[in-house]
UniProtKB/Swiss-Prot annotation:
The gene is lspA. The lineage of its organism: Bacteria, Bacillati, Bacillota, Clostridia, Eubacteriales. The active site is at residues 110, 129. This is Lipoprotein signal peptidase. GO terms for biological process: proteolysis. It is found in: Cell membrane.
Length: 154
């Protein structure tokens, strides 16, 4: 199951980024829902919100370290919880997707833009980012549920 989650996440991420490089890069922006959601081509040379811009080697090294830690954890402890396994697999998938970009392009391709008119723009993101965020939220839920079980609340 974990390998399937990782593979599907990477596949969807790669396909959307290949499309963005081929089509979206030429037009830069395609409005989908007026004043709310656009497809916008961005070459992100940093991390979330552009932090660590130009630090590709550092970001790649940190990503490899985190990936290694998660994989070692999954192999060593073999979590019984399906929620834990899927959430960690999503994080692995997203990390690998963005690592691929950093290694081969020296930037991460971002394409989803959420905004409110021209007043507020959330940083442009990609499928790999979605995998990491959803996986992290699921890990938090798993931890809370696990702690509640220990306390006899669940």
């Amino acid at each position: 199951m974990e390998i399937l989650v990782v593979a599907v996440g990477i596949l969807v991420d790669r396909l959307t980024k290949i499309w963005a490089l081929d089509k979206l890069k030429k037009v830069q922006d395609i409005p989908i829902i007026k004043n709310f959601f656009d497809l916008t081509y961005v070459e992100n040379r940093g991390a979330a919100w552009g932090i660590f811009s130009g630090k590709t080697l550092v970001l790649s090294a940190v990503t490899l370290l985190v990936l290694s830690a998660i994989i070692v954890y999954m192999i060593k402890y073999r979590p019984k919880s399906k929620l834990a396994r899927i959430s960690l697999s999503l994080v692995i998938s997203g990390a690998l997707g963005n690592l691929y970009d950093r290694v081969f392009y020296k930037y991460v391709v971002d394409l989803f833009s959420l905004h409110y008119k021209d007043i507020y723009y959330y940083p442009v993101f990609n499928v790999a980012d979605i995998c990491v965020v959803v996986g992290t939220i699921m890990i938090a839920i798993f931890i809370v549920l696990k702690d509640d079980k220990k306390d006899g609340k669940v």
